[in-house]
């Protein structure tokens, strides 16, 4: 088991990071590699999960150990593989996902990519009551950008502020926007549509 990779972050790609350690470039797949963009060409410490199958091996990386543990628990759910688990992590914060599972909030879970009602029920069935060990593990990994986890959303919110929208209005739609993975212009259009629907 490779617990973590410590080295120089030499590339950030849409699906993975490249971290050079001891002259070797490790390709590390992440839910959102751009969380590390501010640490390009700096030393990072990335918690990892070494996924091994007969025909392939991959390293998956995370911003926190909590995120990694949640990924590993999601892999134990029938019907969820590494791509599905990463898609869920890319679309929500670990604490929000854990809360949805513990509260049996199927409506929130089905918002995640690839999660239908059947899979949402399976996640709740398999994981409810088994996530208590994750609560104390919420500190970010060294090198992870905690403040700007979603640059596209932050840019969209800043643009909306420039248009004259106040924090109270933005807070009402921000949580829903966080559950989606969009480009900046798409976040702006989505936010405007949501605010127009509100009384």
From Swiss-Prot:
One of its GO terms (molecular function) is ATP binding. Keywords: Cytoplasm, DNA damage, DNA recombination, DNA repair, DNA-binding. Gene3D superfamilies: 5' to 3' exonuclease, C-terminal subdomain, DNA helicase RuvA subunit, C-terminal domain, Nucleic acid-binding proteins. It is found in: Cytoplasm. GO terms for biological process: DNA recombination; DNA repair. Coiled coil: none annotated. Residues 143-153 are annotated as: Flexible linker. Residues 64-142 are annotated as: Domain II. Residues 1-63 are annotated as: Domain I. The keyword Iron does not apply. One of its GO terms (cellular component) is Holliday junction resolvase complex. Residues 153-199 are annotated as: Domain III. Has three domains with a flexible linker between the domains II and III and assumes an 'L' shape. Domain III is highly mobile and contacts RuvB. Belongs to the RuvA family. Homotetramer. Forms an RuvA(8)-RuvB(12)-Holliday junction (HJ) complex. HJ DNA is sandwiched between 2 RuvA tetramers; dsDNA enters through RuvA and exits via RuvB. An RuvB hexamer assembles on each DNA strand where it exits the tetramer. Each RuvB hexamer is contacted by two RuvA subunits (via domain III) on 2 adjacent RuvB subunits; this complex drives branch migration. In the full resolvosome a probable DNA-RuvA(4)-RuvB(12)-RuvC(2) complex forms which resolves the HJ. The RuvA-RuvB-RuvC complex processes Holliday junction (HJ) DNA during genetic recombination and DNA repair, while the RuvA-RuvB complex plays an important role in the rescue of blocked DNA replication forks via replication fork reversal (RFR). RuvA specifically binds to HJ cruciform DNA, conferring on it an open structure. The RuvB hexamer acts as an ATP-dependent pump, pulling dsDNA into and through the RuvAB complex. HJ branch migration allows RuvC to scan DNA until it finds its consensus sequence, where it cleaves and resolves the cruciform DNA. This is Holliday junction branch migration complex subunit RuvA. It comes from Shouchella clausii (strain KSM-K16) (Alkalihalobacillus clausii).
